Amino acid sequence: MNLMLTLITNISLSLVLITVAFWLPQLNVYTEKASPYECGFDPMSSARLPFSMKFFLVAITFLLFDLEIALLLPLPWAMQSTNLTMTLTFSFLFLTILALGLAYEWKQKGLEWTE
């Protein structure tokens, strides 16, 4: 009974919100509000704008290290496993690969914003 009541409530609330959002008109329509916005770039201009390669490399490096940190987050739970030696070995190997990647980026001057 509680499941049916919850489902009916959720569906009816969703339908009411969708109906209100669909039927309410925009109060003030300006050209700025009606035009598409794409990260500050003019959507009607050429798609081949000059782009800073240094910014791209720093952004990709940040994304890679951010992903690697996300892979390190489950380590405290992995420490509770029965084979602690294997877990610590893989963790140390993973951190070593991270450190080597960071050292390589640093040596290639990929982390410097200005030259």
Curated annotation (Swiss-Prot):
Q: How does it sit in the membrane?
A: Multi-pass membrane protein
User: Could you list the residue ranges that cross the membrane?
Assistant: 3-23, 55-75, 84-104
Compartments in which it is found: Mitochondrion inner membrane
Keywords on this record?
Electron transport, Membrane, Mitochondrion, Mitochondrion inner membrane, NAD, Respiratory chain, Translocase, Transmembrane, Transmembrane helix, Transport, Ubiquinone
Q: Which domain of life is it from?
A: Eukaryota
Q: What class of enzyme is it?
A: translocase
Record-listed E.C. numbers = 7.1.1.2
Task: Please state the protein's primary subcellular location.
Answer: mitochondrion
Q: Which reaction does it catalyse?
A: a ubiquinone + NADH + 5 H(+)(in) = a ubiquinol + NAD(+) + 4 H(+)(out)
Q: Which GO terms describe its molecular function?
A: NADH dehydrogenase (ubiquinone) activity
Instruction: Please name the GO terms of the biological process aspect recorded for this protein, alphabetically.
Output: mitochondrial electron transport, NADH to ubiquinone
The answer to whether the entry has keyword Electron transport is yes
Tell me which GO cellular component terms the UniProt record holds.
mitochondrial inner membrane; NADH dehydrogenase complex
Indicate the family of this protein: Belongs to the complex I subunit 3 family.
What does this protein's UniProt record list under function?
A: Core subunit of the mitochondrial membrane respiratory chain NADH dehydrogenase (Complex I) which catalyzes electron transfer from NADH through the respiratory chain, using ubiquinone as an electron acceptor. Essential for the catalytic activity of complex I.
Q: Can you state the subunit structure given in the record?
A: Core subunit of respiratory chain NADH dehydrogenase (Complex I) which is composed of 45 different subunits. Interacts with TMEM186. Interacts with TMEM242.
Q: What is this protein called?
A: NADH-ubiquinone oxidoreductase chain 3
Q: Which organism is it from?
A: Phodopus sungorus
